Amino acid sequence: MAKIWRNRIEAGTQEFSKCPAKYRADVLTLMRQDVEDGVITKDQFESLTGEAY
């Protein structure tokens, strides 16, 4: 389910703030990996999550 949330957040169809608490840590981990893999930038990560990279 965390992967679905990550995909929707990155696609702009959902907001991280609406992500259920039980998935947030996993979503952040997946999104940090996406930064490392070049899928999104650090700025996009911070903008999408409101969290510092």
Predicted regions and their residues:
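Viral virion structural and adsorption modules
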Residues: 1-53
